[in-house]
């Protein structure tokens, strides 16, 4: 939740908000030895009741790949991974606010405050009539302007006040944070391409079994971690992907306490075993395994400068498409997707999971955060950059006549209160979903 809490008038604040990060990308079917069309962030399948997960596995994981995470729950894990995720989020906030700040300063527009975080001031200093501060909660930031500040000795008709500047100047200032995040996202992806390369995936037939729960039906009947299920009840699982995982889960669900025939590949051996699913509380079958598509991942590096820009461009536009598509799906299916809207606690939890599982994944985590922040802020809603832009464009349509100050402040105040309420709700909801909090309750 990124809010502007500047003491400057509401009409000249530039607040920011993050949402819909729990599921930032769309699911595309895996392709053999292709660039990933989406983020390295794993997306949980719809079969969480059976511990199945559509997850990418990398050679440079920090922890074993069979670490589980339940759908709708978050686990911060190690302090190191939390700090890494928090640092990424803070850096993105700094970039966004710096975009606004530079756009104003380079045009000679007066700026009174530059803050990272909100709440009580931890440290501050003044330079060139600007107060720079670090605040207690580094999950937001703002750039403050002295417009209509009763304590300011600047004349109200000063041409260098933001409110007195031409429409184009104000549009540049308000949109600069969004532009900065988009540029930063591309720079992150470009750095990833140059430094570690892009992930490629190679698909194999069957469904991988990363983990088998102790004392489960699968454990009792001989299924082991690392096994690959090639067929279920005579149906070949020729393609690797979420469809194959769904086939296995569906057969298991339909056959509680009835034999299910699995053809298994274990190392160089191939054989059949019969598993009898246990009956769960809802009457469906379960065998107590974690499942994932049978894919392996490697890295591809560009061979020359043109290929570097080509790789970075394709990855950037692919991630951008996924972010926009996710936002569209959120609005079109809000009743189903509302639970996936996330606040800063969930974002850091997801980032910590990425950092813990795969250090390289932080590149795309950061790029996705930048793109999400840019897109969300562009929405024409009060308290967002897009809302401020909408008011400026309305002024242009009205021939340069501004809305009455009381009306403008009323619109922005209602938007800020809504965002504050939603932010507090998300923080509480996401905090209650943390694993260690659930264990305490």
From Swiss-Prot:
Provide the cofactor list for this protein: Zn(2+)
What name is this protein filed under?
Probable membrane metalloprotease ARASP2, chloroplastic
Membrane topology according to the record: Multi-pass membrane protein
Role this protein plays: Metalloprotease essential for chloroplast and plant development. May be involved in regulated intramembrane proteolysis (RIP).
Enzymatic class: hydrolase
The question of whether Ion transport is a record keyword is answered with: no
Q: Which CDD domains match?
A: S2P-M50_PDZ_RseP-like
Pfam families documented for this protein: PDZ_6, Peptidase_M50
Gene Ontology terms describing biological process = proteolysis; response to cold
Family label: Belongs to the peptidase M50A family.
* GO molecular function terms attached to this record: metal ion binding; metalloendopeptidase activity
Q: Which UniProt keywords apply?
A: Chloroplast, Hydrolase, Membrane, Metal-binding, Metalloprotease, Plastid, Plastid inner membrane, Protease, Transit peptide, Transmembrane, Transmembrane helix, Zinc
Please summarize what the entry says happens upon disruption of the gene. Answer: No visible phenotype.
InterPro entries, per the entry: PDZ, PDZ_6, PDZ_sf, Pept_M50_Zn, Peptidase_M50
Name the EC number(s): 3.4.24.-
Residues binding Zn(2+): 96, 100
Q: Name one GO cellular component term.
A: chloroplast
The organism is Arabidopsis thaliana
Catalytic residues (positions): 97
Q: Where are the transmembrane segments?
A: 171-191, 373-393, 407-427
For the PDZ domain, which residue ranges apply?
Answer: 196-249
Where in or outside the cell it occurs: the entry states:
Plastid, Chloroplast inner membrane
> By its UniProt entry, which Gene3D superfamilies does this protein fall under?
2.30.42.10
Tell me which residues form the transit peptide.
Answer: 1-84
